[in-house]
């Protein structure tokens, strides 16, 4: 069973066991516009919660993607190199950025669940 949590910077992490899949929300991709490039971290890189994990460039701007939790990068979505627009087409599915092995699952406690994230969007 997986759980999904969200940050106020519009990243999501979908956790199964000790591994989390990280990407940006549909709201984030809609604000960015057409994604033209994604810079992903190296596999094995240690990420710190709130630290830069990736960069996404759109026709409007370049934006940092922050790690929702601390941990080690165990996989990246290499398909985004050839098809960065996948982020726009399926942000919560095939448009994921990286997978991280969680250093401390308790860090998830500070993130929002789906209902909390939807409430947060209403304040924007």
UniProtKB/Swiss-Prot annotation:
Protein keywords: Lipoyl
Domain Lipoyl-binding: 19-101
InterPro entries reported for this sequence: 2-oxoA_DH_lipoyl-BS, Biotin_lipoyl, GCV_H, GCV_H/Fam206, GCV_H_sub, Single_hybrid_motif
Cited PROSITE patterns: BIOTINYL_LIPOYL, LIPOYL
Record PTM N6-lipoyllysine, positions in chain: 60
Classification via CDD domains: GCS_H
GO cellular component: cytosol; glycine cleavage complex
SUPFAM superfamilies: Single hybrid motif
Cofactor field: (R)-lipoate
Domain of life: Bacteria
One GO-annotated biological process of the protein: glycine decarboxylation via glycine cleavage system
Family under the similarity heading: Belongs to the GcvH family.
Assembly, per entry: The glycine cleavage system is composed of four proteins: P, T, L and H.
Protein name: Glycine cleavage system H protein
Organism of derivation: Beijerinckia indica subsp. indica (strain ATCC 9039 / DSM 1715 / NCIMB 8712)
